[in-house]
Amino acid sequence: RTDQNVFVPMTPQQARYHDENAETVARIAAKWRRHRWLSEADQRRLTCALQNMRMSCNSTWLLDRETDHGFKADELAVLLEDVFETPGAKAVVFSQWIGTHEMIERRLADRRWEYVLFHGGVPSEKRGSLIERFREDPKCRVFLSTDAGGVGLNLQHAATVINMDLPWNPAVLEQRVGRVHRMGQRRHVQVVNFIAQGTIEEGMLSLLAFKQSLFAGVLDGAAAEVSLNGTRLARFMESVEKATGAMGRLEVQPATNTESGGATTGRGVGESAPQAAEASAVTEVDRSATGRQ
């Protein structure tokens, strides 16, 4: 198994969403440092802003459903062209959000690449036929899956796993890879992680701030309600500050409003703005491993 991180630049439109939500996180983090306590409303605003920051790393489409500013889906198409140079090669593409796969579907359709889409809303009676098609149909070369849809799947007839985004909990990342890199896999597995440069994703990657499964239910969408207290809240806030650089942001731009603002989910992106010049993604092979981990 080889793991590779591909660093992808952000467009100005993406950065606007990301940074506005980062300011919300910074204000709530400042309140936490003053009072060592957050209301449930503040905790909900915090988790919403964190999710918005992560979604903006993929595309503005996930936030406004009108525009599609972002390079990740295009970089994926380039990567798949390389993968498909090997006869019969297939790829499994994961994202937490079905909106990411909606963007990808457009790129696949433009290139007439056949695929299946697997998510939590797929009826159980249809799941078997989708998996069988991906396994047996030589024309179907891409398996798109959300985390909710991918639980328990065996997809070892593919040898490439592509993560469009990083889950908060590294155990979820390993579960994704484990759909392909598992007992009985005879081929070398290539794992590619797309990371948005200069964003919360880079902070998550470098600091491993959310290493413990303590926060999985809160930040991976499994918890219906968000409520932390005591030691769990303290550890959570410490990780948030590390991953987002909230403390540094406040030192540079002190918040004048001491109350936490709402998360930004629909302003400005639809306005006319120059598209950033597309830059080549920077790749880094950061880890190789043999055998199952």
Region annotations inferred by a language model:
Residues 1-22, 34-143, 147-151, 222-265, ...:
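Conserved Helicase C-terminal RecA-like lobe
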Residues 24-32:
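Cytochrome P450 catalytic domain signature, combining two hallmark sequence patches
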Residues 28, 53-59, 183-186, 211:
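Conserved, well-folded catalytic cores of nucleic-acid-processing
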